[in-house]
Amino acid sequence: DPGILQRGLTAVQECGAAVAGVPVKDTIKQVSPQGQITGTPDRDRLWAAQTPQIFEYALLWQAHQRCTQPVTDDAAMLESLGHPVKMFLGAYENIKVTTTDDLVIAERFLKASSNI
């Protein structure tokens, strides 16, 4: 979806940092180490982060130099330093391919979009 990149380039102009994402559809549960549910976050405020993640180069470079906390992505690094990050609309088909199951899903999306 070329619109994702265009939305990202527009969003990054607001604060120098922007991440694609989609509103979550699932109910998310917080769970203790013992497996007990400890909370249910408000789904209306939860988005699943995707790529692209777009940053002004100098801002990202500085974050990599200053961040000392463990983080899962560059956006979290900027968040940990107190810098705002803008979320922009991605697409549910824009999945992260990490496992063989993900690859099967991605292949289905590609076949459906190209009418194979």
Language model region names:
Residues 7, 34-40, 104-106:
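Short, hinge-like loop/turn segments at secondary-structure boundaries
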Residues 9-10, 38-39, 77, 86-87:
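Short secondary-structure boundary/capping segments
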Residues 29-55:
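Short, flexible, basic/aromatic active-site loop/helix in glycosyltransferases
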Residues 1-33, 50:
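Conserved beta-loop-beta/alpha segment of the NTase-like Rossmann-fold superfamily
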Residues 1-4, 37-41, 96:
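Short, charge-rich amphipathic segments
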Residues 47-116:
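Conserved alpha/beta core of the MobA/IspD/sugar-nucleotide pyrophosphorylase nucleotidyltransferase superfamily
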Residues 20-22, 40, 88:
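Generic beta-sheet signal
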